[in-house]
């Protein structure tokens, strides 16, 4: 007989594990709505080029790509931001700005499976399109911080930030074409600094700029006053990047005022090739990888054929976030088992179940043909707290018996008093 198992790198989530994912989803959804964001649901399958155009080297190598029956090259989405950008151009471009959208969905990457890395995983994220202000950046970071605060993680996490516009402006000034910029930033992201500097040296032929690159790439934990000092350097003015440092200084100062824990890492870049300004990742001391990340991508929508539109967003790794939560207690309703002692009691069993479900109880009807002496300990072992027992005598008197399966306390009451009886026994 053929035996089927999950595909490597993918996982089933059952019971409490599934409930934890749904809990994170509902927590994120409720928060995003309170910030004024509307939900967007995009297809899992998109054109390959949508992601390949500015996904970055690593992302392109790990995409699930296939051709459909019409010979179109398609891909399972490896992330959701490009889909939101495409949907914005297709449906929302004429709407008042900024557009605030949030999403929750599965993404697919053919990575080597390991702890914290899967081939199917979930992302929760937001995109704000049509606003280039520092207020937009702060709103996005504040929402991200508050999500982790709701999970009681805000004291543990650190948001690592940088302005990739520093690198972009220098390379643009010296006419380094986009694909080579992407490759250089990819090498920096993979901590292959010397390789990146070698390529820059070949293309810039300017030792002072290479030395400056090297200087900022080594500043992994930069203080606020250091950013202000860097902004005043003569070489910074000469390279026309003073505004990029001043922006980082302003943003950092306000984050400090908001008591958001962050660190400035001038050597930090992100693997996705579409970032143009602020970039950030959420770090937790218990794991070696980031659990969320995002940034500003002011040119992506224009690249996709839309009108120039600044944008910023982030994606939260749902499974990665769950890995760092020590004690996530999902509030569950009281589990109730309804047991009828004869066929005559079946209509009453269903009527009782309907009543209790309307009151948010979790109700299961017993289908086992076993004596009560076996059923009660069995359901107690399965996590049920209350048993509703309907026998012949109860049926004749329009009564029910309510039993606490933990304390074994039980009372018989008229059917209309069922909810009060459950509360009495708990």
Curated annotation (Swiss-Prot):
Where does this protein come from, organism-wise?
Saccharolobus islandicus (strain Y.G.57.14 / Yellowstone #1)
Task: Report the protein name in the record.
Answer: Histidine--tRNA ligase
> A biological process (GO) annotation for this entry?
L-histidine biosynthetic process
Q: Which reaction equations make up its catalytic activity? A: tRNA(His) + L-histidine + ATP = L-histidyl-tRNA(His) + AMP + diphosphate + H(+)
Cited InterPro entries? aa-tRNA-synth_II, aa-tRNA-synth_II/BPL/LPL, Anticodon-bd, Anticodon-bd_dom_sf, His-tRNA-ligase, HisRS-like_core, HisRS/HisZ, HisZ
Q: Which residues form a coiled coil?
A: none
The broad enzyme category this protein falls into is ligase
Primary site of residence:
cytoplasm
Please provide, alphabetically and separated by semicolons, the GO molecular function terms listed in this UniProt record.
Answer: ATP binding; histidine-tRNA ligase activity
Localization (cell):
Cytoplasm
Q: Which Gene3D superfamilies match?
A: Anticodon-binding domain (3.40.50.800), Bira Bifunctional Protein, Domain 2 (3.30.930.10)
Please name the PANTHER family in this protein's record.
HISTIDINE--TRNA LIGASE, MITOCHONDRIAL-RELATED, HISTIDYL-TRNA SYNTHETASE
Any one annotated GO CC term = cytoplasm
Q: Which UniProt keywords apply?
A: Aminoacyl-tRNA synthetase, ATP-binding, Cytoplasm, Ligase, Nucleotide-binding, Protein biosynthesis
Q: Which family does it belong to?
A: Belongs to the class-II aminoacyl-tRNA synthetase family.
